[in-house]
Amino acid sequence: MGKSVAILGAQWGDEGKGKIVDLLTDRVKYVVRYQGGHNAGHTLIINGEKTVLRLIPSGILRDNVTCLIGNGVVLSPEALMKEMGELEARGINVRDRLKISEACPLILPYHVAMDHAREAALGKNKIGTTGRGIGPAYEDKVARRGLRVSDLFDKEAFAEKLKDILDYYNFQLVHYYKVEPVDFQKTLDDVFAIADVIKGMVADVTTLLHQARKEGVNILFEGAQGTMLDIDHGTYPFVTSSNTTAGGVATGSGFGPRNLDYVLGIIKAYCTRVGSGPFTTELFDEVGAEIARKGNEFGAVTGRPRRCGWFDAVAVRRAVQINSISGFCMTKLDVLDGFEELKICTAYKMPNGEIVEYAPMAAKDWEGVEPIYETMPGWSENTFRVTKREELPQAALDYIKRIEELVGVPVDILSTGPDRVETMILRDPFAA
């Protein structure tokens, strides 16, 4: 009997999901993206060679894996072609191994233009989007005016719909935001050129998944961003536009929740966040700067520096609740090497003096929140590239154990470096 495993971020994204997905894909037949778009940057380092995937599932680097893009993903045809070209230039067969749901909403140039115009108008109050049109494309989906992959293959009807939508967007862009309009004919010509290339990759992803389940093969669902950026459960409004949580697997692929056997939450040994929004344990001192330097904390897609802070058990407890997390993979343990002491946030002190152990939902409810820390001894030994648990310093083992106690879920995988081999699998999600 095959197993179905979801891998998702349990913090604010950038936890190291891509590496872990790639590591576990030697056990699976299918890897599935079910939400987000090319705003996700999944960095893989294999034999010293770095690959950043934004849209195509991380399983594409394994020859025996078929990659699926589910209906919950907003698809930029332009970004897809660029990423395919980069992979094919390295001899990777993409076209025969990538299937795309016909129900994926399309990201088109007017979505990108609107994204940039809005962020510029918001100034210092901006959300901190990646500027790739993700939010506007999801808006069109919910407003039922969006174009989908299936629309690409009726060119006459597509052109009519595009004209109506572009009139709507260009009116706002020109008259409200005072920026240049998006050209209809260029948009049409560009997208039709790409449509002819991807036509053979379009499939009924939901049916493929259910057939795979019947055949008893292993399936891996690859989440993007992180739990605290979920449109419903994150620090709203400083969130992404999709459901980054385990529930997104069902809605974004058509694979029902009872079919999931294991949910692997990815956590860093500390916390990071990109862009605006609440971050209770953020460090503004030399310690924070040192974590950022040692952890190379810059966004894989945007290049933006990440905000760094101590591990926040309060926020991660919320992630455990929302996702029914079975076990954790802790990444970047080695970044904490050499610190004399480490801190873990165990509770929040609210502005009214109340002590809480679960994170608030809305961003406004985080205002004035103070972290309550527990201090633990650090370690001077090197954990980089350690692949046996018994070779870790006792202080590192104690740190991991304390986090397990605080969040109520075991750490089943430990990552001590960027390469796929620099990992300890303590409990295999596909054998659990």
From Swiss-Prot:
Against PROSITE patterns, the record matches this protein to: ADENYLOSUCCIN_SYN_1, ADENYLOSUCCIN_SYN_2
What GO cellular-component annotations does this UniProt entry give?
Answer: cytoplasm
The UniProt entry, under SMART domains, shows:
Adenylsucc_synt
State where Mg(2+) binds. D14, G41
Question: What Pfam families does the database record attribute to this sequence?
Answer: Adenylsucc_synt
Residues that bind substrate: A300, V301, T302, G303, R304, P305, R306
Positions contributing to IMP binding = D14, E15, G16, K17, N39, A40, G41, H42, T130, R144, Q225, T240, R304
Q: Which EC main class describes this enzyme?
A: ligase
| Cofactor binding mode and count | Binds 1 Mg(2+) ion per subunit.
Residues given in the record as GTP binding sites: 13-19, 41-43, 306, 332-334, 415-417
SUPFAM superfamilies from the UniProt entry: P-loop containing nucleoside triphosphate hydrolases
Q: What is its EC number?
A: 6.3.4.4
GO terms, biological process: 'de novo' AMP biosynthetic process; IMP metabolic process
- The catalytic residues are D14 (proton acceptor), H42 (proton donor)
Taxonomically, which superkingdom?
Answer: Bacteria
| Keyword terms, alphabetized | Cytoplasm, GTP-binding, Ligase, Magnesium, Metal-binding, Nucleotide-binding, Purine biosynthesis
User: What does the similarity note say?
Assistant: Belongs to the adenylosuccinate synthetase family.
Q: What is this protein called?
A: Adenylosuccinate synthetase
Encoding gene (name): purA
